[in-house]
């Protein structure tokens, strides 16, 4: 069910990210220009085309989620909003840990739902944080085992 992404998956990957950003991040950032102007499927497809080597999808006949793994860093993990709470995110995260030894990620400080998800999978906030570029928000570093 989890496989390396192909060029044919790019539209679906981008669509999943757009849906998630608008649903979960727009209420925090409230930037119409970005969320309804710049954040578009075609531009994300172009961005991801050069990163296919780090993209993996959960595919059970339909691509329902994806994860981007760069070395041991989890750069992105998104599941189609209508498919959440069905163990898809867990499967993607467990794959990253088992197959790529993924052990760290940055999470938006106000994204408590994501933080709880990662905590359930053995990740813990390290106390290190950095500003989210161009915003007043912060990202928190989470590591597996809190190392």
Roles of regions detected by a PLM:
Residues 83, 87-95:
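Conserved acetyl-CoA pyrophosphate-binding loop and the N-cap/start of the following alpha-helix
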Residues 118, 123:
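Conserved active-site tyrosine of GNAT-family acetyltransferases
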Residues 52-67:
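Conserved beta-hairpin
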Residues 106-108, 124-141:
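Conserved catalytic-core motifs of GNAT/GCN5-like acyltransferases
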Residues 98-110:
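Conserved GNAT acetyl-CoA-binding A-motif
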Residues 1-15:
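A short beta-loop-alpha structural element at the N-terminal edge
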Residues 18-45:
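Conserved GNAT-fold acetyl-CoA-binding loop/helix
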Residues 70-84, 107-108:
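A short, internal acetyl-CoA/4′-phosphopantetheine-binding micro-motif in the GNAT/acyltransferase core
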């Amino acid at each position: 069910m989890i496989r390396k992404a192909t060029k044919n998956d790019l539209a679906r990957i981008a669509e999943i990210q757009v849906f998630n950003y608008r649903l979960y991040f727009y209420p925090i950032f409230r930037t119409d220009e970005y969320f309804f102007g710049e954040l578009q499927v075609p531009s994300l497809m172009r961005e991801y085309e050069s990163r296919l080597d780090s993209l993996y999808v959960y595919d059970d006949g339909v691509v329902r989620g994806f994860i981007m793994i760069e070395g041991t860093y989890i750069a992105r993990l998104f599941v189609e909003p209508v498919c959440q709470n069905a163990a898809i995110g867990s499967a993607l995260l467990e794959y990253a840990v088992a197959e790529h030894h993924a052990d760290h990620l940055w999470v938006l400080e106000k994204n408590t739902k994501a933080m709880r998800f990662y905590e359930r999978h053995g990740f813990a906030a390290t106390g290190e944080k950095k500003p989210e570029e161009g915003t007043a928000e912060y990202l928190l570093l989470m590591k597996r085992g809190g190392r």
